[in-house]
Amino acid sequence: MALETVTLEHLPASHKVYVALFRGVKNAAFLHQQLLARNPEFEYAFIDASVVVSRLQLLSAVFKATSTAVNGALRTPNVHSEIVCTMSSSNNIADAYRRYGISPSTQDLVVVKVTFPGEDGAEPLTQDQIWEHLKTNVEGEAVSITDEQISIATDVPKVRKYYKLNGLKWLDDIQDEKVKQKEMESLVIGAMALRGV
């Protein structure tokens, strides 16, 4: 099963986080339309994988958005849209959806689902139910969500543009690609953390 359960410290045990990565998605337009129609069966954070640099970046956004939801301070309709917005370094929600969320042209897709008991006491979906829904509705190859798989999908020029990392000569001068990747990851996470400050 390519849907991974992730445990994030300092979140209530009742909140479960599931993540998956799909490559070569053929029906991104359909999935995008489901979000626009606010179809409750498609309440996921659909993130364009081309703007994700690492698992740490992704999980930082998930943690921040879920903490915001737990504290009742969401700025968007739900925790999943909050995750997409938290990926951004700016406060512009529409811009965050456009840059970081799924679009009809998305090729590689990160999917995040956060479950928790409903206010009416309803049981949240299980990992198997979520995976079955994703397998049925996402036309793409599910792969493990590792830094290696993420880096294959990352569009570095796009990331540098969105996070305003162009023109950093010291970053360009780093010869070791792993070191450069780690430095870029730190800059991106820092930009996300400083959003709105």
Swiss-Prot record:
- Keyword annotations: Activator, Chromosome, Nucleus, Telomere, Transcription, Transcription regulation, tRNA processing
InterPro entries from the xrefs? CGI121/TPRKB (IPR013926), CGI121/TPRKB_sf (IPR036504)
Query: Where, subcellularly, is it found?
Result: Nucleus; Chromosome, Telomere
Q: Which Gene3D superfamilies match?
A: CGI121/TPRKB
Which biological processes are named by the entry's GO terms?
A: tRNA threonylcarbamoyladenosine modification
List, alphabetically, the GO terms of the cellular component aspect. Answer: chromosome, telomeric region; cytosol; EKC/KEOPS complex; nucleus
Q: Which domain of life is it from?
A: Eukaryota
Q: What is its main location?
A: nucleus
Protein family according to the UniProt entry: Belongs to the CGI121/TPRKB family.
Subunit: Component of the EKC/KEOPS complex composed of at least BUD32, CGI121, GON7, KAE1 and PCC1; the whole complex dimerizes.
Q: What does this protein do?
A: Component of the EKC/KEOPS complex that is required for the formation of a threonylcarbamoyl group on adenosine at position 37 (t(6)A37) in tRNAs that read codons beginning with adenine. The complex is probably involved in the transfer of the threonylcarbamoyl moiety of threonylcarbamoyl-AMP (TC-AMP) to the N6 group of A37. CGI121 acts as an allosteric effector that regulates the t(6)A activity of the complex. The EKC/KEOPS complex also promotes both telomere uncapping and telomere elongation. The complex is required for efficient recruitment of transcriptional coactivators.
User: This chain belongs to which protein, by name?
Assistant: EKC/KEOPS complex subunit CGI121
Q: Which gene encodes it?
A: CGI121
